[in-house]
Amino acid sequence: MSEGEIVQVIGPVIDVKFPIDKNLPNINNALRVIKSENESIVLEVTVELGDGVLRTIAMESTDGLRRGMKVEDTGGPISVPVGEDTLGRVFNVLGQPIDGGPAFSKDHPRESIHKEAPKYEDLTTSREILETGIKVIDLLEPYVRGGKVGLFGGAGVGKTTIIQELIHNIAQEHGGISVFTGVGERTREGNDLYFEMKASGVLSKTAMVFGQMNEPPGARMRVALTGLTLAEYFRDVEGQDVLLFIDNIFRFTQAGSEVSALLGRMPSAVGYQPTLATEMGQLQERITSTKKGSITSIQAVYVPADDYTDPAPSTTFAHLDATTNLERSLVEQGIYPAVDPLESSSSALDPEVVGKEHYEVATRVQHVLQRYHELQDIISVLGMDELSDEEKLIVARARKVQFFLSQNFFVAEQFTGVPGSYVPIKETIKGFKLILDGHLDDLPEDSFRGVGPIEDVLKKAQEMGVTPSDPEAKALLEK
C-alpha cells in the first residue's frame, strides 16, 4: 500500500502528496492519517491535482492535523459492516458503532459505500399501495411500496414529526427491516428516536446511521450512502423489502456545497456545486426496487426560505414517485399535519391503482378545496354574505374537509397529551364521502379538527351537544 504525506490543510479539505513513481490511490479511495497509536482519521480522495497531489475530504474533525503527517492508502473505498448483526445498532458514516455496543471484527462482512446503481434489466415496479394510517397522505398522495417519497417543507413545519409518525405506523405494521439515516439534523432528535424505537420494540429490526449537524461536511456528504449500503445488502443479498428513512436529504446537498469551492470547483446557481444533479442522481438511482427485493424510501427535504425553486429541492423533485408538501399557512391555522392537499401529488393516485371509489373521493376533495381557495379572495374583501347559497355550502364543506384532513399523531402524544390515531384507507374514504355527500352538514366545524375516523367526529359533536339529523350519520353513531 502506498504512503504519502499531508501538504496542505484547508478546514475539512486536505491535500496529500504521494510518490509519483508508485500507484496513486483511486478516486473515492479511503486514506488513513495516523495521528497516534490509537487514533487515526479517514479521508476520501476526491480530486487529483497533478504531480502526485490528491485533494481529499475528511470524514472526521481535522483538529491536530499538520503538514508532513504520514497518510496511508487503504486500497479501497470506505466500507461498512452489513448483515443481520447491524440491526438494533447505531453507526457513524464509517460504519463504527456509536451506541456503546461492541465493535465489529475485521473479518465481518463489509460493503463499499460507492456502488453502481442496479442495471436496467434488474429493476421492477410495484403498484401496491403502502398504507400509512395518515388520512391526508393515504387519500390524496398515496405512497407506493418500493417507491420514493419526498416530504418537502421549510423550517419547523413538521417534516421530522411526520417521518417519526411514519416510522411508528409503517415500521410497526410492516414488520420488516428498516434503515434510518440521519443526515445533518439535530442529534437530540436522533437520540429521542433511538429510545422511542427501543421502547416500542421496533429497534431490533432497524439499523440507524447518523452524521449529524456537528459533523464535518465530509461525513454529512457520505452518511446517506452508508445508510443506503446497509439497505442495499438486505435488498440484494437477503431479498427483503426494506424501508429507508432519510432525514434530511437537503443536508446531503448542503454538505457538498460547503466543500465544493474548497475543492476548486466553480459554483453554479445560488452557490451550489456544479455537480449537484449528478450527485443527487447517483444517490437516488441506487434507491430502487429490483427483482430480488425492494427499497421504499421516505425522505425529508428541507426547503430553504420556503422557496421551491431553490436548486436543491427542485433537483430532488425529479426522482420522486410521491411528494408531500408541508405549508406554513396551515401551521399558522393549527392544522396538523400541515400537508398542502392541492400541492402534494402522487403517481399512484390513479383509478387503476387505488380503485375507482378512492380516486373519485380524492378528486372531489381536491375540487372542493380548490373552489374554496378561489372563493377566499371574495370572502376576505366582501365577506361571506356576498356568496350564493351554493357557494356558502361549498365553503362550509371545504372547511370541514380541511379540518378532517388533520389528525393527532402517536409521536406527538407526549407534547399534546392527546392519543394518536391510525386510520385505515377504507375508513378515510368513508369519512370524506359522508362529508362531501352532505350527511354531516349540521355538525359544527370544530368537531372535525384533530380526530381519527369519522366516528370520532360524531362522538365529539355529541359531546358538544349536537346530534346529527341525517339518518346515515345517526346509524353510524348508534353503532
Swiss-Prot record:
Residue runs in coiled coils: none
Identification of the protein by name: ATP synthase subunit beta
Topological type in the membrane: Peripheral membrane protein
One example GO MF annotation: proton-transporting ATP synthase activity, rotational mechanism
Quaternary structure annotation from Swiss-Prot or TrEMBL: F-type ATPases have 2 components, CF(1) - the catalytic core - and CF(0) - the membrane proton channel. CF(1) has five subunits: alpha(3), beta(3), gamma(1), delta(1), epsilon(1). CF(0) has three main subunits: a(1), b(2) and c(9-12). The alpha and beta chains form an alternating ring which encloses part of the gamma chain. CF(1) is attached to CF(0) by a central stalk formed by the gamma and epsilon chains, while a peripheral stalk is formed by the delta and b chains.
Entry function: Produces ATP from ADP in the presence of a proton gradient across the membrane. The catalytic sites are hosted primarily by the beta subunits.
Disulfide cysteine pairs (residue numbers): none
UniProt-annotated binding residues for ATP: G153, G154, A155, G156, V157, G158, K159, T160
Cross-referenced InterPro entries: AAA+_ATPase, ATP-synt_VA_C, ATP_synth_F1_bsu, ATPase_a/bsu_AS, ATPase_alpha/beta_chains, ATPase_F1/V1/A1_a/bsu_N, ATPase_F1/V1/A1_a/bsu_N_sf, ATPase_F1/V1/A1_a/bsu_nucl-bd
Broad class of the protein's primary localization: membrane
Species assigned in the record: Lactobacillus helveticus (strain DPC 4571)
Keyword S-adenosyl-L-methionine tagged: no
Cell compartments where the protein resides: Cell membrane
NCBIfam families in UniProt: atpD (TIGR01039)
Lineage, highest ranks first: Bacteria, Bacillati, Bacillota, Bacilli, Lactobacillales
Enzyme Commission numbers on file: 7.1.2.2
Reaction it catalyzes: ATP + H2O + 4 H(+)(in) = ADP + phosphate + 5 H(+)(out)
Protein keywords: ATP synthesis, ATP-binding, Cell membrane, CF(1), Hydrogen ion transport, Ion transport, Membrane, Nucleotide-binding, Translocase, Transport
Entry-linked Pfam families: ATP-synt_ab, ATP-synt_ab_N, ATP-synt_VA_C
